[in-house]
Curated annotation (Swiss-Prot):
Disulfide bonds: none annotated. This is 2-C-methyl-D-erythritol 2,4-cyclodiphosphate synthase. One of its GO terms (biological process) is terpenoid biosynthetic process. Its EC number is 4.6.1.12. HAMAP family: IspF. Keywords: Isoprene biosynthesis, Lyase, Metal-binding. It comes from Yersinia enterocolitica serotype O:8 / biotype 1B (strain NCTC 13174 / 8081). Binds 1 divalent metal cation per subunit. It catalyses: 4-CDP-2-C-methyl-D-erythritol 2-phosphate = 2-C-methyl-D-erythritol 2,4-cyclic diphosphate + CMP. Involved in the biosynthesis of isopentenyl diphosphate (IPP) and dimethylallyl diphosphate (DMAPP), two major building blocks of isoprenoid compounds. Catalyzes the conversion of 4-diphosphocytidyl-2-C-methyl-D-erythritol 2-phosphate (CDP-ME2P) to 2-C-methyl-D-erythritol 2,4-cyclodiphosphate (ME-CPP) with a corresponding release of cytidine 5-monophosphate (CMP).
Amino acid sequence: MRIGHGFDVHKFGENGSGPLIIGGVRIPYEKGLLAHSDGDVALHAATDALLGAAALGDIGKLFPDTDPAFKGADSRALLREAYRRILAKGYRLGNLDITIIAQAPKMAPHIPQMRVHLAEDLQCHMDDINVKATTTEQLGFTGRGEGIACEAVALLIKVEQA
């Protein structure tokens, strides 16, 4: 078994800068996150956790923000490509736990769909995926509504060869 940790943060743009995409879900909100890709902090943290567990570097190494090919990239596609590499290395997901840190908008109504997307992309059961959200009680940049942060922990299991 191998454990990986991922972290990501993105700053909000101005009003009308949307869309806001978290966990592969488009969330109604007046601001989007500024990023080279679609800015999905949950999927970026999850991808980093998975890559870290497999010792495959990080999302910035695999999909550099200096490469125009990844401008506006769908983070679900990046996650699927990272997981393809993990499978090729002989590992599969054991479980994934994600914590979204945001003062607003409320994430709870969107978490079930986030779990569905993650289970689809990682070819696993929804019971292997946990997503939760918290605030920082109006402290720090997330508490002031300047951006969203996310942490993820992934467990990979070595696939037995027949």
